[in-house]
Amino acid sequence: MKAIIVLLMVVTSNADRICTGITSSNSPHVVKTATQGEVNVTGVIPLTTTPTKSHFANLKGTKTRGKLCPNCLNCTDLDVALGRPKCMGTIPSAKASILHEVKPVTSGCFPIMHDRTKIRQLPNLLRGYENIRLSTRNVINAERAPGGPYIIGTSGSCPNVTNGNGFFATMAWAVPKDNKTATNPLTVEVPYICTKGEDQITVWGFHSDTETQMVKLYGDSKPQKFTSSANGVTTHYVSQIGGFPNQTEDGGLPQSGRIVVDYMVQKPGKTGTIVYQRGVLLPQKVWCASGRSKVIKGSLPLIGEADCLHEKYGGLNKSKPYYTGEHAKAIGNCPIWVKTPLKLANGTKYRPPAKLLKERGFFGAIAGFLEGGWEGMIAGWHGYTSHGAHGVAVAADLKSTQEAINKITKNLNSLSELEVKNLQRLSGAMDELHNEILELDEKVDDLRADTISSQIELAVLLSNEGIINSEDEHLLALERKLKKMLGPSAVDIGNGCFETKHKCNQTCLDRIAAGTFNAGEFSLPTFDSLNITAASLNDDGLDNHTILLYYSTAASSLAVTLMIAIFIVYMVSRDNVSCSICL
């Protein structure tokens, strides 16, 4: 006879735990924050560069002016500005200009006293305009000016295109024709003759020489007085009689006399005046200028193109929003100078890899994400970890990481806006001081740069603070997302961890990270299937009744034994029974 006994064994599985976590990194970087000082992070975005010196170049996307008149050979920019006979040419329009002459000279024309007037500024003033043209007609009739008639003087040291005696096109050397006598101050009005609403730059001056030459030319050996006035700006001069070295300061031809040259800027419709005595250089052709061209000290030739022109470093291509090193004026799409290197956090706080189960124990590993990070979050900063019989599984939450990246991008954009505002502020200051572009107070400029540098550094510190502090925000969002997905299939045990009622291996965790997790799918195998075992009993002389008798006897004996043991324990606990053990 054969009997079958069916044994039902229910095998339950150990629960897994899922936690939110942060990635780890083996190459920490350091950023500065507003309140935490220096903090190690998993990644940074360098915001500064230290440039090296290079040649000057043309600014990208705009016309850059080197020499005022590129086609005027053997001419300085001052020659062009004064209208030297052999230096008459077209000045091309430009949005940017290079101040390449440290000390302007006239290159063989009449010697000028550079230390007496604003003559050095004249070429620089013209460089500051985008469009520059010389008028086709004279602003006044010099021959018939008050105190005349005059002969228009020329000089062999200022030859014209035919190598005859000549003089500057912007001025007429008014030498009395017949009445070579002393005169009281005379006044001439200078009208506005530009036709396109431009600024009118009117050049004028006076001649000084030895007493002998002054009497010969003008009939008066005494110092002469001169005054110019335009737009509320008045300038006074008294001529010097004699005492000039034979060799000119600019290396030109030997001369006993000198000329002093000045200019005045007349706004549209405004009339200027010149009060003069003998030896006056009356204005003739005038410059009509419009638009703005940014000016910077540099050198020629211009080679290639660059984003930025920097007085100390030459042509720069902008790779970072800020730079460290030597501060100086710059034009174009330039980085802003800051005192120290700046870095923006591009990741999370640095955490060493969390220890695994065998090193720290089960509950130690669960808490690992609080003080350590998890390796394996490919392309992600925040994510999930699963701990169980399968070991440790890790998956990145790319959406959360993207949100963190978006916040960093927003911080970068905010810093860029701050950069643009500061650049506009600097440009505005440059425009306001346009007419004295070479006279900017370096101390004031450095103070402005220091202030802007401090503002930018503080903005970066605050940005880093916000990025690092946002980790808690991202982890809390992940925790809410995880709790919603797990639903009733898990129990919240705190600290961003959940104990599941089912297994959660790498596949399960990947689906959670991807947002495709279905609790029902993984909850089905919470209990293993019933294991049904068939026991075959052979006929060896025992009948069914005998077997049942043995089974019932054993079960009854076990029940009685348990009851007696429980009774003894109860009596001992009530002190009704004592037990002594003797050896």
Swiss-Prot record:
Keywords, ordered alphabetically: Disulfide bond, Fusion of virus membrane with host endosomal membrane, Fusion of virus membrane with host membrane, Glycoprotein, Hemagglutinin, Host cell membrane, Host membrane, Host-virus interaction, Lipoprotein, Membrane, Palmitate, Signal, Transmembrane, Transmembrane helix, Viral attachment to host cell, Viral envelope protein, Viral penetration into host cytoplasm, Virion, Virus endocytosis by host, Virus entry into host cell
Pfam families: Hemagglutinin (PF00509)
Lipidation sites (S-palmitoyl cysteine): 579, 582
One of the GO BP terms on file: fusion of virus membrane with host plasma membrane
Transmembrane segments: 552-572
Alphabetical list of InterPro entries matching this protein: Capsid_hemagglutn (IPR008980), Hemagglutn_HA1_a/b_dom_sf (IPR013828), Hemagglutn_influenz_A/B (IPR001364), Hemagglutn_influenz_B (IPR000386)
Disulfide feature: 19-497, 75-87, 109-158, 504-508
Site (Cleavage): 360-361
Signal peptide: 1-15
Glycosylation sites: 40, 74, 160, 179, 246, 317, 346, 505, 531, 544
Annotated Gene Ontology cellular component terms: host cell plasma membrane; membrane; viral envelope; virion membrane
PTM note: Palmitoylated. In natural infection, inactive HA is matured into HA1 and HA2 outside the cell by one or more trypsin-like, arginine-specific endoprotease secreted by the bronchial epithelial cells. One identified protease that may be involved in this process is secreted in lungs by club cells.
Cytoplasmic topology ranges: 573-583
Domain of life from the UniProt record: Viruses
Topology in membrane: Single-pass type I membrane protein
Misc. remarks from the entry: Major glycoprotein, comprises over 80% of the envelope proteins present in virus particle. The extent of infection into host organism is determined by HA. Influenza viruses bud from the apical surface of polarized epithelial cells (e.g. bronchial epithelial cells) into lumen of lungs and are therefore usually pneumotropic. The reason is that HA is cleaved by tryptase clara which is restricted to lungs. However, HAs of H5 and H7 pantropic avian viruses subtypes can be cleaved by furin and subtilisin-type enzymes, allowing the virus to grow in other organs than lungs.
Family: Belongs to the influenza viruses hemagglutinin family.
Function: Binds to sialic acid-containing receptors on the cell surface, bringing about the attachment of the virus particle to the cell. Plays a major role in the determination of host range restriction and virulence. Class I viral fusion protein. Responsible for penetration of the virus into the cell cytoplasm by mediating the fusion of the membrane of the endocytosed virus particle with the endosomal membrane. Low pH in endosomes induce an irreversible conformational change in HA2, releasing the fusion hydrophobic peptide. Several trimers are required to form a competent fusion pore.
Protein name: Hemagglutinin
Natural source organism: Influenza B virus (strain B/Singapore/222/1979)
Organism lineage string: Viruses, Riboviria, Orthornavirae, Negarnaviricota, Polyploviricotina
